[in-house]
Amino acid sequence: MPYSLTEKKRIRKDFSKLHSILKTPFLLTIQIGSFLDFLQMDVPPGKRKDKGLHAAFKSVFPIKSYTEYAELQYSSYHLGVPSFEVKECQVRGLTYAAPLRVKLRLVIYDKESPASEQVVKDVKEQEVYMGEIPLMTPKGNFVINGTERVIVSQLHRSPGVIFEHDKGKTHSSGKLLFSARIIPYRGSWLDFEFDPKDCVYARIDRRRKLLATILLRALGYSTEEILIMFFETISVKRQGSSYLLDLVPQRLRGESLPFDIASPDGEVIVEAGRRVTARHIKQMEKAGMKTLPAPKEFLIGKTLARDLIDAGTGEVLAKANDEITAELMTALEDANIQAFDLIYTNDLDRGSFISDSLRLDPTTTPLEAQMEIYRVMRPGEPPTKEAAQNLFQNLFFNPERYDLSPVGRMKFNRRLGKEDITGPSILSKEDIVDVIKTLVDIRNGYGSVDDVDHLGNRRVRSVGEMAENQFRVGLVRVERAVRERLSLAESEGLMPQELINAKPVSAAVKEFFGSSQLSQFMDQNNPLSEVTHKRRVSALGPGGLTRERAGFEVRDVHPTHYGRVCPIETPEGPNIGLINSLAVYARINQYGFIETPYRKVVDGKVAGEVDYLSAIEEGQYVIAQANAAADEEGRLIDMLVSCRHKNEFTLLPPEKVQYIDVSPKQIVSVAASLIPFLEHDDANRALMGSNMQRQAVPTLRAETPLVGTGMEQVVARDSGVMVVARRGGIVDSVDAARVVVRVNDEETASDEPGVDIYNLIKYARSNQNTCINQSPLVKPGDTVAIGDVLADGPSTDMGELALGQNLLVAFMPWNGYNFEDSILISERVVEEDRFTSIHIEELTCFARDTKLGPEEISSDIPNVSEAALSKLDEAGIVYIGAEVKPGDILVGKVTPKGETQLTPEEKLLRAIFGEKASDVKDTSLRVSSGMQGTVIDVQVFTRDGVEKDTRALEIEEMELAKIKKDLRDEFRIVETDIYQRLEKVLVGKTVEGGPAELKAGTQITQNYLADLPRERWFEIRLRSEEAGRQLESVAGQLKEQRVAMDEKFQQQRAKLTSGHDLPPGVQKMVKVYLAVKRRVQPGDKMAGRHGNKGVISTIVPIEDMPYMEDGTPVDIVLNPLGVPSRMNIGQILETHLGWAAKGLGRKIGALLESGEQASELRVFLDRIYNASGKKEDLNSLSDEEVLELANNLKDGVPMATPVFDGASEQEIKTMLELADLPTNGQTNLYDGRSGEAFARPVTVGYMHMLKLNHLVDDKMHARSTGPYSLVTQQPLGGKAQFGGQRFGEMEVWALESYGAAYTLQEMLTVKSDDVNGRTKMYKNIVDGDYRMEAGMPESFNVLTKEIRALGIDIELEQD
């Protein structure tokens, strides 16, 4: 495979042995694919599938009026174009959404015609606006009110039927109580359960339980029908004084009968009282016994299967399910009943559960049963016949109230063993009976219960599906209103637009995207955190679990997680196991189940075919691991192969294997697949490692890890933070803010411009206040192909993910500074800005309309010194580039204040300075404490009709100039292309005449055209009519392009100059962006990729750091005790390999310095790249490319060791040897302060370290005087509130134990909530008097009030 533009600049040495046959899929498909299915935007209305918006409309429409003479039908819908681009929405604080227009048809029927064959009287069709639908950006997130949000997929219980037992927890005897539950997609849940006495009960929506037979009766079944459905029958015929029973020999197994069993010829097979064995049964079958003579007594206690009626009198002698007694037998004999049926039950595997339940059942008719159900569902309401029937009908048999969904129906039918997996979305009588039958079978010992946590019983609801459900909710609300108004439609001649109010729909959609539990603020720390957030699968949320209720089993790793959900990446804490991450290759099928790919294995040979299997399908196959040994042709060569079958690991011969894993990294998620040597780390630490990578702050200069896994490129590409070429071509121009590409002719469609302009994002703020900045990688003249990286984004380096920095690390103790995982770093790391990051704070100032008049943004602020206003322009807004510190004014603002009684001093001031000083107060936006930085951008938003200030106009001008430049460049390139094509047409043509004394009959030359100004080319008159027409068409094309450019410019101008949509009451809004540069400092949290985290304890001068024999000081010192107990040995292997990578880079640098030719470099590079692992095709590179590659490798040869398929110990040693480094990875270090060697060799090497977003600057906080709580008058807590430190119970004990009474009193009164005391204290300190008078704490008053609230009068007696 040829290298891309960036790949060939720096090739990663890959140690993988297994050739990956399946490319890593696009990582955001789960989001983007789901939402595209929901919108079906580019599908013509006639061809739309029954899902998403289309399905929602179809499920609610047509809406009929109550009289059924008017009907509103749905025809189709289309989505308009969003008013603003994604970027504009973010700046203006708007939602990126498209207007939805629906074509509706109002049909009015003739009232005279009969209802059966209605005659259409009138049809009106109209497009109706139905609100706005938020659109997904190409990166898979949404912009809601200007902030980027992600809709997390939900893992919920699949609809269908599930059988389980209580594990013996309900009853004290430990008896297993079985239950079945029918879960619909929407509608009432139906449960069936056994009680300890073995009767079957039903519950609807977890209400009070009622007998299952009541439900069966409500469905219209009689006692007799119920018995015949659930039991086999035994026919009994009377023969003299004894009775003949139908004999099925198998039924007698294990029984002991009170009489002899004899064959027809009189031979006794089983004696009375003996147990019947399999041998006896064989003898009976051999003897051909069809009936069994039994005495009358044997039948007593058995149960009748059918009603017995005296044929002569019509009298009912016995009812179905009656137990036979001696009296009944006599009555039957008297009535001369010759034959009757019994139900067949036994204690072993034919329980009489339904029969027992029927005996307890008080109801006899369907209506009585329905009334009983009504009483349970609506307790306290008197039931009527209609109400009871309607309620029961609506519970499970009304498509509007109950929906199993195609998934539910498929799961339901599969579980009950039906062939056909399709069917109605409501339940049928047969469905309910089948479920009870299966439940009884399981209780009887046939079949087994289901595993609730099996991924075949849990499905994923993605964005599209959840949005569709919300949309349907909105439509149902609209439907009620429409139905009311439809009756007016014909009399008042209304149109569809007047019938529909789109508010409820847009409100439902807005609520879902804005405030649903699964609509989350996007984690935008770095590209990886964005990707993982979009691939997250949560079991929480509406219709899911809650943290408190979720038990251990739900959270645990399940065998079906293999290849579907990552067993490693999940949060620590209360959400552990409830929030998971999709595995790298996993995808979601049409039913919402997670599938994972496997390669087919036929007769022990791996085929090229790849099949995706869901958890249900996977169980029946034998699946080998990706690393199973195979020869060149793909034959499995081991005698026994490690396989998975039915969720268990086992060893089987190769010919039994049916599938094999696609890749070793199949089982882990994206974040875990970025950890090198993951196979050498303990799972708990790997979990921390994958979670901490998501918290890494993008550094000023990204540095790709020396030891990676090969997934870095995939994550960076799919995250969308880099600029990737949309079409191939040649780079025309590059600057820091944009890249212009002249597109190849063959990739340009006729209606598209032949130029792509990529505007780069410069210093934008992310959701986490980190900095998003893109910088170009290409040079003018470079040839780029589609998909090539043109510019790096945050935390990417040459198209690869780069979350941290490679540091030279030593594992050794150093003066106790690395106690308890502390980290010691060298001053050089700070000096070189290795971990310096830029954070961008957004500060907003509103100018509102108040009762006393409008607030004003200006630089004329009362009682403020000139120095304080020095950073503001005349409009009162800080200028860009200003360095600001806490307390500085960013936006000057004054608010009118009411007239107050003036003090003599104020009167004097007023007399001197005039009116202004008093009627407004200063409410400027100031820099808050603990924040300082540089102003990098200012945005001014003005409401329509409010005059724009000078600053707003300036910003507008700059934006317009930018747009103009882009359009001009686009036009310039298009124009050049047109003229080049025209030149080909004109050169060599014979002319009639033309400008610059061109004579008729002469031929046009290139020189002539070069001298003639381009715009005059069109004056040339050609002899050939065909060529003349071509000339005219080109002139037309140019004119069109010019007009199009002007139009585009006017549109953009109109957008820019229009007023902004601001919240009510806001006249003007100013946003100021501050860039804060944060160097690494003690207290910052750092970590590696293996869960090895720590806090920086101190920064040591370079000269004091331990140094190696060649004088190189190390960058960072880690505690060796952090490794053995944590069992994350991956970090040590990474350190060794990183050292080798750096050493090889140094050797390449030396070769370059000594002026070696490309051929020598090729030899050395070949030794590195092709000694082991994946082979690289260095011959495809030209000599210049080899030199450029070598130059990029000087700082270290990047290596890739994919998870579970990485570098072996031997390969690491080989690399160290090649780099002329000790193969044990250790070297002698010398103390930087004394110069003496340390006692033993130390493990040294390069490790990729991350700076996490837990910075000491964000946590450090001190309070002087600040806000107090309203009720208790105690200081608030926390940095956000500028709060104080709580002096708690244990702190009080500490002071008590020292007897520091006055300090204690001060703490509990004046420093806390003694309002008068603290005011007095303040005055005393100002007067230089340091005495303290403690008063009554406010919390004491609160206590007295609370005691009074209990009805106890309490008051303080004053002396």
Curated annotation (Swiss-Prot):
Protein name as it appears in the record: DNA-directed RNA polymerase subunit beta
One of this protein's GO BP terms? DNA-templated transcription
Do the record's keywords include Plastid?
Answer: no
Q: Does the keyword section mention Transmembrane helix?
A: no
Give the EC number(s) listed in the UniProt record: 2.7.7.6
Which species is this UniProt entry from?
Answer: Nitrosococcus oceani (strain ATCC 19707 / BCRC 17464 / JCM 30415 / NCIMB 11848 / C-107)
Pfam family, any one: RNA_pol_Rpb2_1
Q: What class of enzyme is it?
A: transferase
